[in-house]
Amino acid sequence: MVSNLELQNKIAILLVSHGSSLPFAEVTFNEIKDKFNKATGFATEVGYMKVAEPSIAGAVENLKEEVPELEKIIAIPVFLAPGIHTNIDIPTLLGLSPLETDPRCPDGNYPDDHYLSIAEDVDFDGDIELLPAIGP
């Protein structure tokens, strides 16, 4: 049987947020991150789709540094409901297949200045499991 400590040495949590320019948003997400870490014991980072830092790719780098034997990242969108961000943007930013066709750009070729075109690629060789939005 695998112990919780063994799992903590191989699995980390990525909480994914849209991002905001409002300073209290970062404070709120750091509080959520700290509560999640305390409740689960797993290394936890917040990654932002846009506007705020760290980016999703940057948060993955932070997790890789914190958990040297990292094999799996469980990504949890901190959104109230599923939608374009949780079904298309976040999977794409994580290097996963979108869960549906993007009605904004059905061919998947985004303009050069679109955030999905300019975002950093996630550099992770392990598994990434994307859970549904954390909302109700």
Whereabouts are the PLM-identified features?
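Active-site-proximal alpha-helix that buttresses catalytic centers in soluble enzyme cores
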Residues: 1-136
